[in-house]
Amino acid sequence: MKKGEANKPDKPTRDRALLSLQTYLSSARALTPLDYLKLHSGLFYCMWMCDRPLPQQSLASSLASLVLSLPKNKIVGFYRGFWEIMKKEWERIDVLRMEKFLLLVRRYVAVGLEVVRDNWTGEEEEENVGEGVLRVVEEIPCRVGEGEMRVPNGMKFHVVDIWVDELERVGMLEEDVVGTEEGKAKLERVLRPLRKMQKDSMNKIVRNKAKDALADERLPGNEKDANSDKDEDEDEAKDGWGGIED
């Protein structure tokens, strides 16, 4: 994609550039980790230069959707390249541009979860593309232990904050999904990055955010009992000030 094409007002120009990129990525040519980094550096610049909310939203969705158009043997490398560049560039994103990059990260989290939803088979081997995507998440935005401090906190916070939202968006919290053994196992694997962060992160804020995310009422087992709400209301009424009695 040529510099500036993502910022042109006409959508057809952006679409042609993205189609050309998709064709390139789908070719038989093998790409190296350096190729993916160069590619995502260019895509980062395109988003950086993209003005106005609607084009930004469209571009963020289009860039993330490239993942689903790739041959399976290129998905993990492409996904890793995105997170490596975001880790490298995050702290130079100014406040005026941050919102569109938060959206871009949200779209990439969602598409990564789609890959896991459709491809994770329970075999925790990196050759499995769903497992490979989850390992990228654990090694970069949700990293704990050695190297954790090199991951920008803002990026980490955002990923934790949106994780359950995007799980819900891609349908991984539907009752007919989590009601199966496969669905339960898949969800447990997808929640593992948060569990690791809650337990082992060196950053207290990260630990607390992960704890809050894992306590989300949308997750199985966290549903709030309607009777508990009633009991809380009654307790508050008892504790509340009832006015001055005559």
Placement of each model-derived feature along the sequence:
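Eukaryotic alpha-helical solenoid repeat scaffolds
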Residues: 1-5, 10-15, 21, 26-224
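Acidic, serine/threonine-rich intrinsically disordered low-complexity regions
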Residues: 224-246
